[in-house]
């Protein structure tokens, strides 16, 4: 972290890494563990409906390689298509993780696009917040929707950059920038990152962090890609803090003409 920077704070807890990672799509638990270590991430998200964190005693337990003592676990509601399913999944996560209250809410609209269903997302967020969950919420890149979720009490808003798993990168940087500039909670790009340059762009826009899974797990060398993403997030953040030069239509000479010898 740059000496010019301040740590990321989510739900009152401080983090030095602004890269958050998922646990799906890896070949095995060993690769999962090694990639997460290479990423330097401190927040690791887990799909409760697809991962074993103790509910299936006879199967490999993800918590054997991702200890709650080393990482902040972020249970998510991936695979939920209505508010009722999402709320039930968060309650299960709280039970399995001994009262853990930080969750990532995502309520999907359909299986083709995996875009969020905002009506169901609002309903689920309202219930979860009333039940004292700390909700980090997946949403689209609509600035109005993002602000509404913030005002409801979500502790972080996570707009998509592009469809989940698409690797298309930041499709609408202007909307992401608008969300960032109007927010008072952390804005974390979630979904659509494909390579290191995408992560850097998200950070250069002023996002507080980036969450990704497929971009690392689906790479030909996940461990190396995890390391690349770590560096990209750090470089993008430093570039944002440094302040880029303005874009110009015409050239601007690097060396002044005044004081030349001939």
UniProtKB/Swiss-Prot annotation:
GO terms for molecular function: thiazole synthase activity. It is found in: Cytoplasm. It is an enzyme of class 2 (transferase). One of its GO terms (cellular component) is cytoplasm. Pathway: Cofactor biosynthesis; thiamine diphosphate biosynthesis. InterPro entries: Aldolase_TIM (IPR013785), Thiazole_synthase_ThiG (IPR033983), ThiG (IPR008867). 1-deoxy-D-xylulose 5-phosphate binds at residues 165, 191-192, 213-214. GO terms for biological process: thiamine diphosphate biosynthetic process. The active site is at residue 104. The keyword Cytoplasm applies. Its main location: cytoplasm. Its EC number is 2.8.1.10. It catalyses: [ThiS sulfur-carrier protein]-C-terminal-Gly-aminoethanethioate + 2-iminoacetate + 1-deoxy-D-xylulose 5-phosphate = [ThiS sulfur-carrier protein]-C-terminal Gly-Gly + 2-[(2R,5Z)-2-carboxy-4-methylthiazol-5(2H)-ylidene]ethyl phosphate + 2 H2O + H(+). Keywords: Cytoplasm, Schiff base, Thiamine biosynthesis, Transferase. It comes from the Bacteria. Homotetramer. Forms heterodimers with either ThiH or ThiS. Belongs to the ThiG family. PANTHER family: THIAZOLE SYNTHASE. This is Thiazole synthase. It comes from Nitrosococcus oceani (strain ATCC 19707 / BCRC 17464 / JCM 30415 / NCIMB 11848 / C-107). The lineage of its organism: Bacteria, Pseudomonadati, Pseudomonadota, Gammaproteobacteria, Chromatiales.
